[in-house]
Amino acid sequence: AYTPTQIIPLRMGLAYLTLWALRPKTMKLPWKDELMFILIGITGGSFYFFLQNTAAAHTSAANVSILVSMSPILTVILAQLFSRKGEKLGKLVYIGAVVAIAGVVLVVLNGTLSFHLSPMGDLLALAAALMWAVYSILVKRYTERYDNFLVTRRVFLWAFLTSLPLVLLTDGLPSLTPLFTQPNILISWLFLGVFGNAVCFAIWNIAFKRLGVVVTNNYLYASPFVTVVVGWLLLDEKISWMSILGAVLITLGVIFANKSTEK
């Protein structure tokens, strides 16, 4: 009923309304901060998902998964270049990143040994990874200054608003009729908007504040393996020896990287 691009404003809008209903408190911001929140909404919301979805149309799902999983190492680089306070990082964080990325590759390939380059799609996926890295650095800065709940809500507001031009220029605004006439679509929408966005982003932003962006984003390396496990549990998909080895490498990589950031 909906294209991937049309789903973006639907889930972002629902996430914003959910958080607003839970705390209908006005958040007044200086105009400079408001501009930064627009950028945060773009990098962590509208453009991040748009680039990822568009990449999937031009390259394989394996390529997208592997390249988007590069966001933690890009976060490390940006944290060193632009973070005001700076997170102390040692050599182990880079070793851990290499080990974890190797694990991600094994998990995503899952025994197929098939990886084909597709320049346009691959660059879009890498751009999505960069978007998330920028979002991570910026949102941590503002969760230290403002209430995390209100920050997350503001991010979704701008993610929703900036996704509208993308939809208008591509697939057109989505009709709301299927949401109320097809129960399976309604359930999927509620899951994506309430849990996938509102709840998960709020928790993730808390982790940014408490653990730092580098440590928190290191756990993104585990995402492909979690996907494989869920596929095994719910869809009866097979897990190969490559996936198991990949999971071990991901775990070791995260341990190495997090050890490096311990103060």
Residue ranges and their predicted role:
Residues 19, 38, 77-78, 89-110, ...:
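Hydrophobic transmembrane alpha-helices of multi-pass small-molecule transport proteins
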Residues 1, 58, 86, 145, ...:
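Helix-loop interface residues and adjacent transmembrane-helix termini in multi-pass membrane transporters
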Residues 6-17, 44, 53-87, 91, ...:
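Specific alpha-helical transmembrane segments that line the substrate/conduction pathway
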Residues 9-10, 45, 49, 64-70, ...:
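Helix-helix packing/entry segments at the starts of transmembrane helices
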Residues 1, 57, 107-120, 170-184, ...:
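Membrane-interface helix termini and inter-helical loops of multi-pass transporters
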Residues 4-21, 39, 93-102, 120-127, ...:
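Hydrophobic alpha-helical transmembrane segments of multi-pass integral membrane proteins
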Residues 14, 43-44, 51, 74, ...:
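Hydrophobic residues within membrane-embedded alpha-helical segments of Major Facilitator Superfamily
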Residues 20-68, 102, 106, 193-211:
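Specific transmembrane alpha-helical segments of multi-pass solute transporters/efflux pumps
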